[in-house]
């Protein structure tokens, strides 16, 4: 049956351009259609005031409907997968594909800067006779212009068949999808708003069936689900703020996705039913604090890396009614990653020194998960800041982020250990910060380690076949400029300082002779490391450090420049013009740190709960907290001496009063880490040397804690 040529396609300019509540997401050009239809665009980030074009290709003469939505929702049908949420969809165009099988429509985007960041999802459906078809899904985000600025790629995952690699960018809210067989970028897919909080880690993971990839961003109340086959955003699943890691358990009990929630101090369980729909079904409480890493053990238990209480905790995800706790494994340091090979668990970490002098040891701890005995310690200070690891039967690969190197070994007999300089052709080096082992197309033993460099904004493969010395393939630029970012030449002053903060460069370190520490060793991602050093003091967090002079626990540095110089001297960095320039850059970087991450304990509109409001009254009144921690920075008022003597059951010590901003994320507390929780901090104050809290009842203390968690 032919369609009347008089029925011309009718474009619609949707009123939704002006909807202020649209989720901020981004999409890229379509790589392939679900069936024979293909939906493409001239730009994934059209600017306000521009014309934006869509092209639909399919069967000549087919009747089609092009629809848009403000939310994705995966739903499988007989003729394809629909990603448009029918409750919020609207028609964009309809008609008949021309004899070439094409249809194009152009939208004028109003020149209204308030539209920047709004998102729309598009998908088309068609019918030619009895044959129905649906196109790929496409999302676009309205921007102010062409993408620019830093992206900071920081997480990586790969499908088990080696067909796709996913790289999540921390700063511009996108995921780059690559074909590792051709080293080609397939798509730039948006998953979160701009800007995101670059001080929190993202995570990306692919489920065991290879059907979906999941992205969590601690700064967002959503988990993005990517449909692997069509490379479309399948869903945005509501989660609390401050979710930090993803793991899976697909078995006879169903398909479950586990998410580490720092807000809940728990593991959240999401069940898939029906296909593509993920709904929270349970909450697994944790005894430890700061869940940041997850891994499924061979016995079906879940391993959780806890960054605040410096331990690992094993829980039973099938125990939904009782206490899921199985055991805990003290580490005394943070589990920077979890890499599993059967019952063997490899945990990269930094173990602080217990004596005055050396700072500590970068090492990979090996545990037997059947007994949780420590089997061995590997790679002592062969690199600096082992922020990521991956393991297969053939290779264990560990990123020495700060030293610009990657360690490769054979994980059974450790018959060789090779330190790979990731940028042998240039100096200074980059920051290799994430790694995935990827098999050849079709699956099998991984033959390449794909390494993401956070500062150069590149991905590069180490060819693992043949043994050492290992071959490096060419860098693939991920930066908006299309070229690797040189750590010194292509960054502004604060960005250079951020690189130096994370690097051993000015600590006279190199890939083959690293210094044991960088600034980021004790202040990773601007957080406290929760480690009490041999000097009896915890490393302070860098939240809002620009506005919280004086600095250091003793308050001896009146400004950031003095503080930086003292830190350099503490680590043996003295003299020379290069180090003077480095100190100035690091100072500029710290001066850019003016805020703490948004608290996940506030209401969605930023308001306080009733309990937190009661706690605020106590904070500013009866408890006397505001005497030393005055808003808005929660440090002593300018009329008071910056360094006060405070004893909280730990002996009187001269302690610079720290800001309380971000205190919800920096357990344990007090200068020596003796208070495990905020409530413990209040309970230790039996002589009221740290506010007047000894007379508060349990309910009042709970209210005060609820307020502190909102800062």
What are the roles of these predicted feature ranges?
Residues 143-499, 504:
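Predominantly soluble domains enriched in secretory-pathway, periplasmic, or organellar proteins
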Residues 150, 297, 334-341, 350-352, ...:
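Periplasmic c-type cytochrome electron-transfer domains
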Residues 1-12:
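N-terminal secretory signal peptides that target proteins for export/translocation
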Residues 15-28:
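Bacterial N-terminal signal peptides
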Residues 136-138, 235, 282, 327, ...:
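Extracytoplasmic/periplasmic beta-strand context in beta-sandwich domains
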Residues 112, 236, 283, 328, ...:
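Short basic coil micro-motifs at the edges of alpha-helical modules that engage polyanionic partners
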Residues 27-35:
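Bacterial Sec-dependent N-terminal signal peptides
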Residues 34-146:
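Residue-level hotspots within well-ordered secondary structure
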């Amino acid at each position: 049956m032919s369609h009347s040529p008089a029925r011309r396609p009718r474009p619609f300019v949707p009123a939704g351009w002006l909807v202020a509540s649209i989720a901020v997401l981004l999409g890229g050009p379509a790589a392939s259609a679900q069936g024979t239809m293909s939906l493409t665009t001239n730009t994934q980030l059209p600017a306000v005031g521009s014309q934006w074009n869509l092209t639909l290709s399919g069967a000549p003469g087919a009747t089609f409907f092009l629809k848009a939505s403000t939310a994705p929702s995966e739903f499988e049908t007989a003729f394809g997968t629909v990603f448009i949420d029918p409750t919020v969809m609207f028609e964009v165009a309809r008609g008949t594909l021309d004899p070439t099988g094409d249809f194009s429509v152009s939208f004028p985007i109003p020149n209204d800067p308030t539209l920047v960041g709004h998102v729309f999802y598009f998908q088309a459906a068609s019918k030619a006779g009895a044959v129905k078809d649906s196109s790929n899904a496409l999302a676009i985000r309205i921007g102010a212009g062409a993408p620019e600025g830093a992206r900071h790629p920081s997480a990586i995952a790969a499908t088990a068949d080696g067909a796709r690699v996913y790289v999540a960018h921390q700063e511009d809210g996108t995921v780059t999808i690559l074909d590792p067989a051709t080293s080609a970028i397939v798509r730039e897919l948006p998953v979160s708003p701009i800007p995101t909080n670059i001080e929190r880690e993202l995570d990306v993971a692919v489920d065991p069936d290879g059907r979906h990839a999941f992205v969590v961003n601690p700064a967002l109340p959503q988990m993005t689900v990517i449909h692997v086959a069509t490379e479309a955003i399948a869903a945005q699943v509501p989660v609390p703020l401050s979710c930090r890691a993803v793991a899976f358990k697909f078995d006879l009990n169903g398909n479950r996705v586990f998410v580490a929630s720092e807000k809940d101090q728990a593991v959240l369980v999401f069940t898939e039913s029906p296909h593509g729909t993920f709904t929270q079904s349970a909450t697994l409480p944790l005894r430890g604090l700061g869940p940041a890493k997850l891994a499924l053990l061979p016995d079906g238990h879940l391993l959780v890396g806890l960054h605040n209480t410096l331990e690992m905790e094993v829980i039973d995800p099938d125990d939904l009614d009782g206490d899921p706790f199985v055991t805990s494994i003290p580490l005394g340091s943070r589990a920077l990653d979890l890499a599993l090979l059967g019952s063997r668990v490899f945990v990269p970490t930094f173990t602080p020194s217990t004596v005055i002098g050396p700072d500590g040891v970068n090492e990979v701890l090996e545990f037997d998960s059947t007994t949780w005995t420590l089997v061995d310690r590997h790679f002592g200070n062969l690199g600096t800041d082992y922020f990521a690891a991956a393991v297969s039967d053939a290779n264990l690969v560990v990123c020495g982020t700060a030293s610009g190197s990657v360690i490769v070994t054979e994980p059974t007999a450790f018959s060789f250990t090779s330190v790979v300089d990731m940028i042998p052709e240039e100096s200074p080096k980059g920051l290799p910060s994430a790694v995935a082992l990827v098999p050849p197309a079709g699956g099998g033993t991984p033959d390449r380690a794909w390494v993401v460099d956070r500062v150069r904004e590149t991905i590069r493969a180490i060819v693992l076949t043949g043994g050492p010395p290992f071959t490096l393939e060419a860098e693939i630029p991920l930066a908006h400029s299309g070229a690797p970012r040189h750590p010194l030449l292509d960054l502004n002053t604060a960005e250079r300082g951020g690189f130096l903060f994370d690097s051993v460069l000015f600590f006279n370190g190199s890939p083959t002779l690293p210094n044991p520490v960088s600034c980021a060793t004790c202040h990773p991602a601007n957080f406290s490391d929760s480690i009490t050093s041999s000097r009896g003091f915890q490393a302070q967090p860098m939240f809002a450090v620009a506005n919280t002079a004086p600095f250091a626990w003793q308050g001896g540095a009146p400004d950031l420049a003095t503080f930086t110089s003292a830190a350099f001297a503490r680590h043996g960095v003295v003299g020379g013009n290069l180090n003077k320039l480095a100190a100035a850059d690091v100072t500029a970087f710290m001066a850019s740190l003016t805020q703490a991450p948004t608290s996940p304990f506030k209401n969605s509109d930023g308001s306080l709960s009733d309990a937190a409001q009661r706690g605020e009254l106590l904070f500013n009144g009866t408890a006397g907290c505001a005497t030393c921690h005055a808003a808005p920075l929660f440090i002593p008022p300018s009329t008071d001496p910056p360094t006060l003597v405070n004893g909280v059951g730990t002996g009187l010590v001269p302690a610079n009063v720290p800001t309380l901003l971000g205190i919800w994320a920096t357990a344990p507390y007090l200068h020596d880490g003796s208070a495990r929780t905020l409530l413990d901090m209040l309970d230790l104050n039996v002589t009221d040397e740290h506010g007047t809290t000894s007379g508060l009842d349990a309910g009042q203390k709970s209210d005060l804690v609820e307020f502190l968690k909102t800062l």
